[in-house]
């Protein structure tokens, strides 16, 4: 890089010439070799300047390189500012080249795991070009200063560009290291969970960074405690975002009350927040105050967030992961069985779920909190119509006609007792969205619990799947005998069966009420069979890859839809 006349065009041509000569070198090597060539002259100059007054040889060589021109008082006054500008720009350019080197080292990671690297690697040729052209411009400026010709190379455009590039590289490298920390934590956790040894080891690796002081807040005393309280315990990890409701928190309170008596099981809330703010901390404190169990108070991103999302299918909706004292996962999400069976699902393991999933008498557990008189009716083993729907007119018509059917002499003479339970109404007969929400939430939880097994769905599961497909229809009906689900149907077809009661009531004594009801309904749906559609909320956990229709042997089509109820926390669904 010999002295050239100042000017951006000349600097550009010189840079292209350098790139051409170094064509066979990597991009980071191109930048380093160019900087090394400049450093040779630049370093010589300042070394000679340093030794100028004490070494005769240095003084003689310095005269040849025009060092005194710069060092003498007029030179310092004339070129002092330019020298500082030059020095600062070289330092910034050196940092750019070092950053390019660091990015090159990080290419051992897949860009799928470290997305920050994807665009950064594409920008490296451009960044190196600007590093080299800046070095060329600095060389020209050095020649102008030592030549004392009154000319100068304008460096401010190069300084602006280099500083922009440097800021981008700093942010990229910082983000890349954060993403690498996540992937390394993920790999570490996978290894730990393959050969677990103790629940506390798993818990620390899942939540805290190395330099953090792990602790919990005891919700019953509001005091900080050591994580040693989890030692040799079965731990229920209640994992959620801050967008949870009091209703969702209350689901765990009966479980907490039940397990607190024996002190072997502990519940710990792990809030998942990627970027904490003062507002989110306030929200955290409000939610935490509602929980009597332990809480992780750690205002940094959870170390194992990638593991939680990918291995436990966390999608911002609450999950409950059950871990035994040895650190082994006993259930990746026991929240479904807790919603349906509560403390009856104890100890909340896959084995416990397997036992519960074989039960056919589920309506009593699902209807807890819906109708206080219901347990008595269920224990009497009576037939019950549970019904509801979007169309109030259909609801009124069904109430009227089903009541007439229940009171018909043919039913009374056969000693058949039928009760009607309208879901979604409180004791005063008013609409209650909370009751309806709990009903569908429990139905969905029961269905997901049953479908996680890789076996053919049983009769009850198929009936619940049918019911879920009617969730947004004008009307729907569940017929149970006591707590056992007998039948579910669409409002339109069930209404027709009830309308035409006179045509089949003569068979009630001979065949049996539930059998003839189902047989006649099967006859009706041969003529009028509505489409079946099952909505699966996006955050429930692992979504089935495919689903068979509950009405026919076909595989259901898959659609994606989006839903907003105009409240915080948009409800995304997969259909």
For the regions a protein language model found, what residue spans apply to each?
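Non-globular targeting/processing and membrane-anchoring segments
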Residues: 1-268, 272-274, 279-287, 329-575
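Short linear interaction motifs
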Residues: 217-220, 298-317
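Short, surface-exposed basic-aromatic patches at helix termini and helix-loop junctions that form
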Residues: 285-290, 313
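Short acidic-hydrophobic, aromatic-tinged amphipathic segments that line or gate anion-handling sites
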Residues: 293-303, 446-452
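Metal/cofactor- and membrane transport-associated sequence elements
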Residues: 320
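Short, acidic, Ser/Thr-enriched surface-loop or helix-capping motifs
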Residues: 323-324
